[in-house]
Design a protein with these regions (language model features):
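Long, His/Glu/Asp-enriched segments that create or flank divalent metal/ion-associated functional microenvironments
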Residues: 1-158
């Protein structure tokens, strides 16, 4: 049985979260994949850039499906751009910490220039320390799916 549990305390992002975790995101992706009966070795391997990239792409795409109640395309575009911005910013901090050796003070200083306070910076720093390259799997995977669609459209296939 496929179940998605909803945190009723945080419903502001419910629509894109359901797109990411449910349909057309991970739920669709996993049910489709399981039905293919692929080589068993593929079930042993983990491809977070592929799985999270796909779910992140469809989550972002969900913003274009929202009923913006009179705000139209501007509202949808703003949400999508803010979503990409946040992924890019967190990915940049991840690279700073794990590749360039940033310390907590460096993350705080960097994020202050984007309007984030120290407690927000500390929370992001802790998540990045605990899960290296996690944001990169979402963001780079998302970019790969975006590029795939762009190439597909460029070659006249729609």
């Amino acid at each position: 049985e496929n179940v998605i549990y909803i945190n009723k305390a945080q419903t502001a992002e419910l629509y894109p979260t359901l797109a990411h975790e449910g349909y057309p995101g991970h739920l669709y992706q996993n049910v489709y994949y399981a039905a293919r009966n692929d080589d068993p070795v593929r079930y042993l391997l983990d491809y977070p850039g592929y799985s999270e990239g796909y779910a992140t792409y469809v989550e972002g795409f969900s913003y274009s499906m929202m009923d913006a109640e009179g705000y139209g395309d501007i509202y949808q575009q703003m949400n999508m751009e803010m979503y990409e911005y946040n992924l890019a910013l967190c990915s940049r901090v991840d690279l700073g910490v794990h590749y360039e050796g940033w310390k907590k003070k460096d993350v705080r200083a960097y994020l202050r220039s984007f309007g984030m306070n120290d407690s927000q910076a500390d929370e992001l720093f802790q998540m990045i320390i605990e899960n290296p390259a996690n944001y990169l799997s979402y963001y780079i995977g998302y970019q790969e799916f975006h590029e795939l669609l762009t190439d597909y459209k460029k070659n006249g296939r729609e």
